[in-house]
Amino acid sequence: MLDILEIRKYLPHRYPFLMIDRVVELIEGESITAYKNVSINEEIFQGHFPHFPVFPGVLLIEAMAQACGVLGFKTANKTPEDGSIYLFAGIDGVRFKRQVVPGDRVYFECKVVSAKRGIWKFDCVAKVDGELVTSATIMCADRVVG
């Protein structure tokens, strides 16, 4: 549904911190499904870990938050160019169930739980080949920048 050029309109992140490659489904105000292709060419694997490359869990959480940001921006019909940004406000119930390694395509599925006074709450999961990798409840704050 959204390719990387469209995603860049809704997220202020750029290389090397843009974690979403494509959005495959988005229902405004409800849910988003996006993915990231994990490549051995990513710089993070030079240090995490050179002889046993594992994609860091904190970056999986960041990717979930970025998917939530795209959903929030699309739902509110805003972009960062409008002077708005979604900031990571909190996380609850994080669980890591499986390692993510080069060659994996990680799907992020996030659903809106609530949106009140600019604070959005999402239930999120990450999966590889249909297998649960990570789950978390993420909160983002819609704020004016500048």
Swiss-Prot record:
InterPro entries, A to Z: FabA_FabZ (IPR013114), FabZ (IPR010084), HotDog_dom_sf (IPR029069)
UniProt keyword Cytoplasm present: yes
Reaction(s) this enzyme catalyzes, per UniProt: a (3R)-hydroxyacyl-[ACP] = a (2E)-enoyl-[ACP] + H2O
EC number, as in UniProt: 4.2.1.59
Matching SUPFAM superfamilies: Thioesterase/thiol ester dehydrase-isomerase
Keywords: Cytoplasm, Lipid A biosynthesis, Lipid biosynthesis, Lipid metabolism, Lyase
Gene3D superfamilies with a match to the protein in the record: Hotdog Thioesterase
Active-site residues (renumbered): 48
Subcellular location: Cytoplasm
Entry's Gene Ontology molecular function annotations: (3R)-hydroxyacyl-[acyl-carrier-protein] dehydratase activity
Pfam families: FabA
GO CC terms: cytoplasm; membrane
Biological process annotations from GO: fatty acid biosynthetic process; lipid A biosynthetic process
Functional summary from the UniProt entry: Involved in unsaturated fatty acids biosynthesis. Catalyzes the dehydration of short chain beta-hydroxyacyl-ACPs and long chain saturated and unsaturated beta-hydroxyacyl-ACPs.
Family indicated by similarity: Belongs to the thioester dehydratase family. FabZ subfamily.
UniProt-recorded name of the protein: 3-hydroxyacyl-[acyl-carrier-protein] dehydratase FabZ
Natural source organism: Teredinibacter turnerae (strain ATCC 39867 / T7901)
Lineage: Bacteria, Pseudomonadati, Pseudomonadota, Gammaproteobacteria, Cellvibrionales
